């Protein structure tokens, strides 16, 4: 009954959510059991099967696959990610409504998340992008769900813990956690947050990161998330590094970019002629990572303007109307439904731990082969849908600029600042430390839409929208409680007059002393609440 009431009261968003659900059912029918993202998916699956870290990438997604292994179904993994995509839309809608925005505006903010074809494609892929985005949106929901009120320590700690978990899926989660801690420290200085809240958030956010690093150290003898941070930063410098300017020491000269036309930065890691392949121990050995980090820092210090220009160029790619072909056409094709079933990853390619792609797929999928199959006509429908239904980078830039402009004008746009900072961080950090990739934009969209819609919220949400009762959550409704109705005033009742007592006849007994006369009724009750004062009733959902 409560669900039916909720659907009726939020019919516009319910229709959008139902259409988005149908779209995800179509994706599940079109590409079975799950779409495969090359070496990335192979690495995560190997971690999920053997609990062995891959030094080239953080393996938190592998732990998710390990947790989902008992049903032995890769299709279940894709289904879960579709649910997370829908859940992000629901959380954005709920927050927008809490901040007093109308249903149409709250629903509009969810459209890029619910219906973007590239969001849908990544939900179908065995990659951590969608779980990462969900953790970020859920953390924002916990932090912002009570507009105009102090954040409780427990809720803030839970949000920090979620951001710590997100760092195990994408390392940029560490930067988001640092932003939250910086905001809390600033709030502490102006007495808007207590020291207990800040300490709880710090410990909660550090817990998953420290636990993963400890697990990584048992295999690699290095307390870290990966063994590739230096390698990726080195690749960033390959688009501009000039060793005649850098003058690296002899041990690092091998890392100078090869002569000739420069490639996209990240390709220098995977290219067959990469200088990394000439070093002993491989591309991701501890020694290689250390040398690459030293070279990268020298290059940035020697050529800061060139570094800034390279980063600016790649950040600008995020806002092109047409999706840029970067790093190369082969990478871009991986984000297309049209190429989902292309066997561009050899089935016998080796995976961490000594397995193969085909063998690991079968091992996870109850012994059955699990290559991606495109099922017609559903796959053809999705290919057509992807040609038109996506958020161009230019519109993402407009969403970010709109949120920033409104915040600058209104100054106190409650709730918009933190999601805006998160969205910009997700867009900027990858080109800052590695390279631009189209998939890095998708997790930024929910936070960007949330920031834009909250920037237009009332300066302070009405009190009846800030206080949502437990009964509202229990019935599944999300409407604010109705304000209390004052009780009608009752007219004062005059005290009855006592009839005069006749004086007694003459008596030989002397008259007694006079007793004090009681005060009138009005004076006796002046210290009590007036009968005309309405009694406040608790709000109901």
Question: What annotation goes with each model-predicted range?
Answer:
Residues 75-76, 309, 313-419:
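Membrane-interface anchor segments at the N-terminal boundary of transmembrane helices
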Residues 9-35, 115, 204-215:
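Transmembrane signal-anchor helices characteristic of membrane glycosylation enzymes that use polyprenol
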Residues 65-72, 77-91, 132-135, 390-400, ...:
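Transmembrane alpha-helices of multi-pass, membrane-embedded glycan-processing enzymes
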Residues 30-44, 52-72, 225, 308:
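Extracytoplasmic catalytic/substrate-binding loops of multi-pass membrane glycan-assembly enzymes
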Residues 104, 142, 146-164, 196:
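Short hydrophobic alpha-helices at membrane interfaces in multi-pass membrane enzymes
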Residues 226-363:
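Membrane-proximal stem/loop segments at transmembrane-domain junctions that anchor or position
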Residues 1-24, 458-464, 541:
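Start-transfer (signal-anchor) and selected internal transmembrane alpha helices
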Residues 39, 77-86, 108-143, 153-154, ...:
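Multi-pass, polyprenyl lipid-linked donor-dependent membrane glycosyltransferases
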């Amino acid at each position: 009954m409560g669900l039916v009431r909720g659907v009726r009261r939020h019919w516009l968003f319910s229709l959008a959510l139902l259409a988005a659900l149908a779209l995800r059912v179509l994706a599940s029918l079109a590409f079975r059991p799950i779409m495969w993202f090359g070496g990335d998916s192979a690495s995560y699956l190997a971690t999920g099967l053997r609990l062995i870290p891959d030094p080239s990438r953080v393996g938190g997604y592998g732990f998710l696959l390990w947790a989902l292994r008992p049903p032995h179904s890769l299709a279940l993994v894709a289904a879960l990610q579709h649910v997370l995509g829908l859940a992000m839309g629901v959380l954005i809608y709920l927050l927008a409504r809490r901040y007093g925005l109308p249903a149409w505006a709250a629903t509009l903010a969810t459209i890029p998340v619910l219906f973007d074809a590239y969001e849908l494609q990544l939900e179908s892929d065995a990659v951590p992008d969608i779980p990462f985005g969900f953790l970020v949106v859920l953390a924002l929901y916990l932090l912002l769900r009570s507009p105009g009120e102090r954040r409780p320590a427990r809720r803030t700690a839970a949000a920090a813990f979620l951001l710590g978990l997100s760092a195990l899926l994408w390392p940029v989660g560490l930067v988001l956690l640092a932003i939250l801690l910086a905001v809390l420290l600033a709030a502490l200085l102006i007495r808007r947050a207590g020291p207990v809240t800040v300490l709880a958030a710090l410990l909660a956010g550090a817990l998953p990161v420290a636990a993963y690093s400890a697990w990584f150290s048992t295999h690699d003898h290095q307390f870290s998330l990966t063994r590739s941070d230096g390698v990726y930063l080195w690749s960033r410098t390959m688009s501009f590094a000039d060793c005649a300017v850098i003058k690296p020491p002899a041990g690092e000269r091998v890392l100078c970019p090869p002569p000739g036309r420069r490639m996209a930065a990240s390709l220098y890691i995977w290219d067959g002629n990469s200088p990394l392949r000439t070093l002993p121990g491989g591309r991701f050995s501890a020694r290689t990572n250390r040398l690459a980090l030293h070279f990268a820092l020298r290059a940035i210090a020697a050529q800061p303007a060139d570094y800034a220009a390279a980063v600016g160029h790649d950040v600008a790619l995020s806002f092109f109307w047409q999706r840029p072909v970067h790093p190369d056409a082969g990478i871009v094709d991986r984000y297309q439904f049209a190429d989902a079933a292309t066997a561009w990853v050899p089935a016998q390619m080796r995976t961490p731990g000594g397995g193969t792609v085909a063998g690991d797929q079968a091992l996870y999928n109850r012994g059955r082969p699990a290559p991606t199959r495109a099922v017609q006509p559903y796959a053809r429908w999705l290919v057509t849908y992807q040609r038109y239904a996506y958020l161009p980078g230019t519109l993402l830039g407009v969403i970010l600029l709109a949120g920033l402009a409104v915040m600058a004008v209104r100054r106190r746009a409650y709730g918009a600042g933190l999601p805006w900072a998160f969205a910009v961080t997700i867009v900027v950090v990858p080109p800052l430390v590695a390279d631009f990739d189209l998939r890095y934009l998708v997790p930024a969209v929910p936070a960007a839409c949330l920031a834009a819609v909250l920037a237009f919220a009332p300066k302070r949400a009405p009190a009846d929208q800030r206080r949502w009762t437990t009964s509202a959550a229990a019935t599944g409704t999300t409407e604010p409680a109705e304000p209390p109705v004052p009780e009608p005033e009752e007219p004062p009742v005059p005290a009855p007059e006592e009839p005069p007592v006749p004086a007694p006849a003459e008596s030989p007994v002397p008259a007694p002393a006079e007793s004090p006369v009681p005060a009138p009724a009005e004076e006796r009750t002046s210290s009590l609440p007036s009968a005309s004062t309405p009694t406040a009733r608790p709000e109901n959902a």
